[in-house]
Structure formats: structure tokens, C-alpha cells
Amino acid sequence: MINHDEWLIVGLITSPQGINGKIKVKSLSDFEERFTKPGIRWIQKETESPKKLQLISGFQKPGKESFVITFKEIKNRNEAEKLKGYKLLVKVDEIPKLNKNEFHLTELMNLKVKILENNKLKIIGKVVNLENEKNNLLVIKLLTNDKEVLVPFVKEIIPEIDIKNKFLIITPPPGLLEL
């Protein structure tokens, strides 16, 4: 299990790329250098301890939020295939400092989702995932029916985020939560 007090998930290893051990990573970060600048990186499968690897190189796929990276220790496609599903991590103490009211997307995970109903805030679900290949979308699991809905991550729909108190408020347009 990932200790979110120590680690921040910045990418998801999705597949091998080619036959020479290159790996495709879906980015959950705004900091491109995490995938392109050589140095130590950490990967983890959900139930294992983080493993240290040496990033040699990486580049962003044109028009995508994914990168192709090369680790020194991964020599071929078979080794790369074994890393599918691993998370790319950074230590929390190595996270760049953000300005006030800024946060890392992964900090939205497990936040309670509230909606204003009859002038009172009501919890309707929680953030269970992020979809960000083309647009940033929050996957929200509703309490009423366990259904998952996609909510665009835009200020008009999500006007308030309170990381410290672990909730966000949404103002969905009619029908969004019924899709």
C-alpha cells in the first residue's frame, strides 16, 4: 500500500514501448522533468515496497500526456511488460513547492465530494480516480448508487477545493450526475 504521507504518485506505467525495454507512462504531473531528466526514480506495485530505478532518458509523446521512458535496469520488452500497472512515485519531501491555492492532482484522490442542496452542503460521494489523457476529469463514486461519474475538472463545476479538510464542492450542470 502506498503511504501518501511519504510518496506522491506522478505517473502510471501502462505498457512497454518497442523491444528494447522502453516503458510508456501516463503522466499525473505537471512537471515534465519527472519523466525526462535522468536520475533516480521510484516505482511501486500496490502491495510491494517502492523500488529504486535509474532513469536514463524520456520524451513526451506528441499531443499526449504520456511519456516514453528508459530505465537503466530494464533491458528488454519482457522486463518492461512486468512493470505494467506499477506507479511512478516521488518522495513527498522532493515535491516542488506550490503557490497558495495550488495542489497536486493526486491530492484530489479520496476527497469527499459535496454539493449545495437547500443551502446546506451534502456529501454525495468521493473522488476515486483521475482521467487525464486529453482532459482532466475526476471520477466520482456516488454514495446513493455506487455509480461512477466523470466530472470535468473546471472551476465552473468545481468552484472550491479544500485539501486540508479533504473535500471539494461541485456545482454540476443538470444531468451531469445522471450520465
Swiss-Prot record:
It is found in: Cytoplasm. It comes from the Bacteria. Its main location: cytoplasm. Residues 100-176 form the PRC barrel domain. One of its GO terms (biological process) is ribosomal small subunit biogenesis. Belongs to the RimM family. Binds ribosomal protein uS19. The PRC barrel domain binds ribosomal protein uS19. This is Ribosome maturation factor RimM. It comes from Prochlorococcus marinus (strain MIT 9515).
